[in-house]
Amino acid sequence: MLALLALVLALAGFSACSGSDEPGATQSPGVVRVAGGLISGTEVDGVRAYLGIPYAAPPVGDLRWRPPQSPDSWEGVRTCVRYGPSCPQPLGDGLSFFPLGETDEDCLYLNVWTPGAVAEGDGTGGAAEGTTDGAADGAADGAAEGAAEGAADGAAPLPVMVWIHGGGFSTGSGSLDVYSGIGLARLGAVVVTINYRLGPLGFLAHPALSAEDPSGASGNYGLLDQIAALEWVRENVAAFGGDPENVTVFGESAGGMSICDLMVSPPAEGLFARAIVQSGPFDSSGAGMDAVRPLAEAEETGRELSRRLGCDEAPDELAALRAVPVGRLLRAAERTVPRGPGGLGFVPVVDGVVLPGDPAALFAAGELHDVDLLVGANADEADLFLLGMRGATAAQLTRYVRRLYEPDDDAVLELFPDDEHGSRKAALSKAVTVMGFLAPARFAAASVAEAGADAYLYHFARVPPAVGDLGAFHGLEIPYVFGNPVLVLDVTGGVDGELSRAMMRYWVSFARDGDPNDGVGAAAGTGSETASGDDEAADAALPSWPAYDPAS
């Protein structure tokens, strides 16, 4: 049971790496020039990894609750072989299965994985010579020469996949072991994972913050971080062999919700061509969660937090709030925001600027960016959320349903009767899964297709033996997408290995040109085409995946 609980917590996004190097990494002198200066990374299984790259200035002090700023430049070559700190988040001792490792407000870092064969044109030779004798100029010259050599080779730029992690907008990190991009990079993609501000640091609105900002709004600092990371990718990913005009954002849970927000956000337009949304509906009311909040409501929450912290009577309220130690801020925030059954607290804000309206309504109206979409959910999403209700009585579960779905609770109980699902708990799990995840995923696919872009819909139903009596719960698909084992769940061999390789190939093919049915063997006749040349990865051609038809 402990192993199962640990697996569930890991996939729910509660565990982050402690800032260590990639397993099996050997330090490489390969040097790449990015905004800010020169960086070197590591090589793991033939893939170059650059970890802990700053994409924005530390959002600390006076930069707390401000849009992300450009990072400071540095002299010489910055060694990027360790993950940066995760963003502060409220994790208690009860989750000691996975120590979070280092957290810090200085957390706006990203990680890049790129196939070594592509990254060879990064100035390795000249850079190594330059850094050996301490000459930064030599490193820069080497980088330029290497880049020119890479361009001369005529290698086509690779598709770029940017992962936005989940965690209810309050927990998580881009540096989880399960998010390592090695496997996807070996299939021919440049993979980027990012951190963004969470909880009250990422999504606090307050009238004084709105008045201070030229836009007249506040509350979407976490989304602005994601946009800043995408801008960094557009400006720098070519140095890693990636195509800045061929970027796919993909994410799960709150990461998927974020992507839906970005698909209707004016500042994000043009920063990505495709999106993959895993179990991240833009409208999560069917799961008892408010994925966005109106600005006025969010500002009132900010007022209450300030009162709770004793900052509302200060001569300079914002200065007082910015001086509050982060631990105290997080504890006060947990007491300030009433959490519904779904568990979301601080969330993105409909501010009229970053989010011009409710994303669900904008999708329905076709007011979204021209972005191809691959979207889906798992067969038993809610089994994770109901894990703590194993011993609940039918009466307790009924009260939960009524609280979750009022004033439509009677209709829900009628639509999902116990006798059709075996028990009240099974019926509740199906209700939350269908209304909170499966139906919104289908609606998102239909909205995109009706707007004229391509959409593909999936349904993940695999239940590996390692999960016991749980079904295909929320987050279970993540190890399959990245090809990374998690504790007792091994996705590298057997049936689960085959499924993982298939999903990875579909995902990378979609990232390449918006069609999962080509590129790395996802269509008949192309089954042997893999970037890695790995016989195990070069399975037979996968079944054809038809585009979503709203009429179906």
Locate each region found by the language model.
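Substrate-gating cap/lid region and adjacent catalytic-acid/histidine neighborhood
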Residues: 274, 282-289, 320-496, 506, ...
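Short, solvent-exposed turn/loop segments enriched in Gly/Ser/Thr/Pro and often Arg
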Residues: 197-200, 250-254, 459-467, 534-549
